Amino acid sequence: MAHKKSGGSSSNGRDSESKRLGVKKFGGEKVLAGNILVRQRGTKFYPGSGVGIGKDHTLFALVQGAVGFVTKKHNRTYVTVTPAAQPAE
């Protein structure tokens, strides 16, 4: 039995693939219904009006309009989509 470990191998040197989380559409940006607004783990951001939430806590637009971020009670940040004004016909 060798009393010294052979050189040339490392027990470290691995990392997991990044998950590309974060805010995808920022305040004031125009979005279409179905656009992903935030990818997150848990509810760092909460859905406000015009925004839905997926089973993995992804926030997405339910309507076409402009994105907004609002901080309300309990220091919760809500993401909203304000519908674009419909042109008069």
Curated annotation (Swiss-Prot):
Query: Keywords on this record?
Result: Ribonucleoprotein, Ribosomal protein
Gene Ontology BP terms: translation
What SUPFAM superfamilies has UniProt attached to this entry?
Ribosomal L27 protein-like
Q: Which Gene3D superfamilies match?
A: 2.40.50.100
The question of whether Ribonucleoprotein is a record keyword is answered with: yes
Return any one Pfam family short name.
Ribosomal_L27
GO function term, MF aspect, one: structural constituent of ribosome
Region described as Disordered: spans on this chain: 1-21
Q: Is Ribonucleoprotein given among the entry's keywords? A: yes
Instruction: Identify one Gene Ontology CC term for this UniProt entry.
Output: cytosolic large ribosomal subunit
Family from the record = Belongs to the bacterial ribosomal protein bL27 family.
Q: What is this protein called?
A: Large ribosomal subunit protein bL27
Q: What taxonomic lineage is listed for the species of origin?
A: Bacteria, Pseudomonadati, Pseudomonadota, Alphaproteobacteria, Caulobacterales
Gene name tied to this protein:
rpmA
